Amino acid sequence: MPEQNPLPFPDGQSAPPSPAGAETGATAAALPPAAPVALDAPAPAAPVLAPARVAKRPWWARLLGRLADPWLSLTIEPEQPGRYDDGKPVVYVLEDYGLSNALILDKACREAGLPSPLVPLPGDPLERKRAYLALSRRSSSNSLIPEQRGGKTHSDSLAKLLQAHRVRADLDVHLVPVSIFVGRAPDKQSGWFAVLFSENWALVGRFRRLLSVLLNGRTTIVRFAPPISLRQTMAEGLPPERTLRKLQRVLRTHFRRIREAVIGPDLSTRRLLVDQVLAADSVREAIATQAKRDNSKPVDAWRKAHAYAWEIAADYSSPVVRSASFLLTHVWNRIYAGVLVHHLDKLKQAAPGHEVVYVPSHRSHMDYLLLSYLLYERGIVPPHIVAGINLNLPVVGTLLRKGGAFFIRRSIRGNALYSAVLSEYVAQLVAGGYSIEYFVEGGRSRTGRLLQPKGGMIAMTLRAYLRQPRKPVLFQPVYIGYEKLMEGNSYLDELTGRPKEKESIWGLLWSIPKVLKQNYGQVVVNFGEPIALNDVLAKHAPEWNGEPLPDDEKPTWLAPAVDTLATQIQTRINCAADVNPINLLALALLSTPKHAMGEADLIAQIELCKKLLAEMPYSDRVTVTPHTPARIITHAEEINVLTRVSHPLGDVLSVSGDTAVLLSYFRNNVLHLFTASSWVACCFQNNRRMSRAGLLRLGRTVYPFLQAELFLPWSEDRFAERIEQTIDMFVREGLLLNVTDDDGGILARNTGQTDEVFRLRAIGHSLQQAFERYYIAISVLVKNGPGVLGAGELESLCQQAAQRLSLLYAPAAPEFFDKTLFRSFIQKLRELRLVWPDENSKLMFDERLDAWAKDAKFILGRELRHTIERVSPEAAKPDVVSPPAE
C-alpha cells in the first residue's frame, strides 16, 4: 500500500499548519507542527534521553512482553534515538491508555536503548509506579466498528506531575510524546481482516485492539517527538489550571497532527457534523419558518431537519475504506484489463494549500468507486462524494456512506428546509477542509456525450467558500474512459424508450455474477487542468475583497460565476479525454451504412484518425492508445465488440444490432476531438469543390453551436486556425487537392469512389447528424413563422421531426432526437440574437435566419434537405369557432 497523505501534497511539502491555540510560549514551540509528508521522509530530530534506569521492569511486563514479542515488529522514528546525558528524568506521553500501548512503548524503548516506561522515576512523582502517562482512556466498548471516538478525559497523572514540580524546585521532568500506529497500512497480502483492524481515529475496546495487534502488530510505527521541559513550561507563570489545560491542548494538537500525517484526517464525524448543521443560524431560521408554515411545534420541525441531515450525512470509516480497497483490487483485476492513471502528479503539484473539489465525468456507477479507489491507492484521502438518494439501498447505502458518500435528493425545489440543511452540510465540509466529489452533469450520460452541467452543487460550494474563505478552492476535472460499460444494456433499453428501472438490492445482487464473468477491457482516468476558484472570482467579482459574505447576501455576479465554472469544468474534462481502441473503431465503423469494413480499409481509417490526433493535438492532457491498428482490432475481438467474417477477397469486420447502437456511445466520447476535421470533411460530402475562404466563413458561423454542444475550448479565430491546419493536412494526405489560388484557394476532393473519398466521407460522418439537427430546428421555425412557437413548443416539434426523419430516411443514433440537444441549440440561437422572445414568449426572427438556412446546402444534400422540410411539423392551429348565424 502506498503511503497516504491527508491531502495530495508532494513529498516533503507541508500543509498549512492549523492553529494550536491563542497562547504561545516555550510549550508550543517545543512541539513543531507535524508536516503531512510520506513516512519515509526524514523524521524530526531524535530525543536524547537519560540512561536506562537500574530498577527492573515488573514481572508481568516481562512475561507479557515475551508473549507479545513474536507478534510485534516495530518501525521506530527517528531511526537512531540518542541518549540524554544530563540526568534529567523522562516521562513518555501516549495519546491514550492501553496495555498493548504500554507493551509496544516498552519494546520500542528497549530496542532503542531508552529508559523503560514501566520503571518509575525516583520519588515516583506520578504515583503510578511507571514513567508514562496518557491523555485519554480507551472506551470499554468492544464493538468492531464503533461509530464515535470515546470522550477525552482529564489527565490526573499530568496534573500530579505538574504539582510535583511546584513542590520540588529541583525537579525537571521532560515529557516525550510518543505516537503508536498498529497496522497503519498493512500489505494486501495480510488479508481482509488485517485491513479491517488497522489503525484509525476511533478509540476502540480491548478486544478490537487485541485483534489489531495479532493481525497487524508486525507493521507497527512508533514515532518519538522532541522532549518538553516541564520546568520551562511552568516558568511562563500561568495559573496552575491554565498551565494544565494549555499543556494538554498542545499535546493533543501534536498527536492529532501526527495522526493526520500518518493516516489522514478524521473523517468519521457524522454526528458532530449533523449537530453543527442543526446549530447553524440559517438552519435554525429554516426550522422556525417550517414550524410556522406547518403550524406545528418547533421540535417537530427540528426532528424533520435532523432526519434530513442524518439522511444526507456521510459516515466515513477508515477500516471500511481499507477493506473496500482490499476487495476492489481483486474486482478490478477480474473485470478490467488494467486501470491507467495520467496527470495525477500535476494535481499533487497544484493542490497544496487548497480545498480540492473533484468533478469527474459521469458515465457509470463505477465512477464512484474507481476515483476513490485510485486516490486512496496513491496515498490521497478519498473525497466525500455526492450520490443520488436512489443509491441509498440497504447494505449498499451503508457501505457507500462509510466510504465517504453523502446522499442528496434528485429534486429539492419547494423544500426550503431540506435545501437549508444540504447547503449547510456542504458549507461545513468546505469549512472543515474535506475534499469533495460531485458530478456536475447530475446523472450518468446515456449517450456518451458530456451532458449540460447543473450548477446546484457548484453554487453551494461557491457560497460555502464565500461565507468562510479559509482555504482557496481548486476544482479538479477528471475524465474517466471505458472500453465497455456494465450498464450498456440498460442504457440501450432507456434510449429505445423503456423507463429507467429503479435500483434495488436484489437487482444488484442478481447482476454481480454476470458482471464478474465479463471482460470490460481497460479503464483510463485522466486528471485535467485544475480550475482555481479565485481566478473565476477575480474575473466576475473584481470588487470582492476576500472578506466573508453573509448567507443572506446574494451578489449579482454569483450566477454568472457559477455558469462560467460549470462550462469550464466540462470543457476541461473534454481537454483530458482518452482515445481508446473502441473509440477509434466506433468512429470508423459507424461511418458506413452497414457498420462494416474490410480489414485493410479499417486499418487505414484508424491510422488516419491517430494521425489527425498526433499532428493537431487537442490539448497536452489528451491521451491516445499506443496500440497499432492491427492490435486494436485484435483487442476488440477479444472483448467481443467486433465480429470477423471470413471472405476469399478479404475478411470483413463489423458490428451489428445492439452493439452498433452502443458503439455510438464510445464515438460520442471523443467526437469533440475531431470537430475541425469532421467539419471540413462534411463540407465535401455534397460538394465537389469549395473555396478555402468559404470553408472558413461557414466554420465561423457554425462554431458557436458546436462549441455549446461539445464544450470546445477555442475562440472562433482559433477554430479557424484549426480548420486551416486540417485543410493543409488533408492536402498532404491526398484527401483534398489545391485546384486554383482564387478566393484564397479552391479545394476539391477526388472524383469517383477512390480510397481517399471513402476516408474523407468516414471522417465527416460523425458530425453529419449534428448539422441535420440544426437544420431541423431552423426548418421548423421558418415553416411556422415568427411569433408562433415558444421555446418549449419548438423543442417538442423538433424532437418529433427528428424521430420521423430517422424512421423515413435512415436509422440515427439515439441522441439524434434528444430534446436537450435541441434545447441547447435554441438557447444558443437566443444568445446570438438570431431569435428572441416577444411579449407572449413566442420566438421572433428575421431574414438572418433564412440566410443561415440557405448555407445548409453546402453541408446537407438536396434530398435530405427536402425530406427535413417535408417532415417539419407545424404547430396545431386553434379551432376557430364560427359566429352564430343571425
Curated annotation (Swiss-Prot):
Pathway(s) of this molecule: Phospholipid metabolism; CDP-diacylglycerol biosynthesis; CDP-diacylglycerol from sn-glycerol 3-phosphate: step 1/3
Protein EC: 2.3.1.15
MF annotations from Gene Ontology: glycerol-3-phosphate O-acyltransferase activity
CDD domains attached to this UniProt entry: LPLAT_DHAPAT-like
Pfam families (UniProt xref): Acyltransferase, GPAT_C
Ranges spanned by the short sequence motif HXXXXD motif, renumbered to the chain: 362-367
Coiled-coil ranges per UniProt: none
Keywords of the record: Acyltransferase, Cell inner membrane, Cell membrane, Lipid biosynthesis, Lipid metabolism, Membrane, Phospholipid biosynthesis, Phospholipid metabolism, Transferase
InterPro entries reported in the protein's UniProt record: GPAT/DHAPAT, GPAT/DHAPAT_C, GPAT/DHAPAT_LPLAT, GPAT_PlsB, Plipid/glycerol_acylTrfase
Composition-biased stretches (Low complexity): 20-29
Location of the region described as Disordered in the Swiss-Prot/TrEMBL record: 1-29
Domain of life the protein comes from: Bacteria
Protein's cellular compartments: Cell inner membrane
Membrane topology: Peripheral membrane protein
GO CC aspect terms: plasma membrane
Gene Ontology annotations of biological process type: CDP-diacylglycerol biosynthetic process; fatty acid metabolic process; phospholipid biosynthetic process
Annotated catalysed reactions: sn-glycerol 3-phosphate + an acyl-CoA = a 1-acyl-sn-glycero-3-phosphate + CoA
Domains: entry comment: The HXXXXD motif is essential for acyltransferase activity and may constitute the binding site for the phosphate moiety of the glycerol-3-phosphate.
Family the entry assigns: Belongs to the GPAT/DAPAT family.
UniProt protein name: Glycerol-3-phosphate acyltransferase
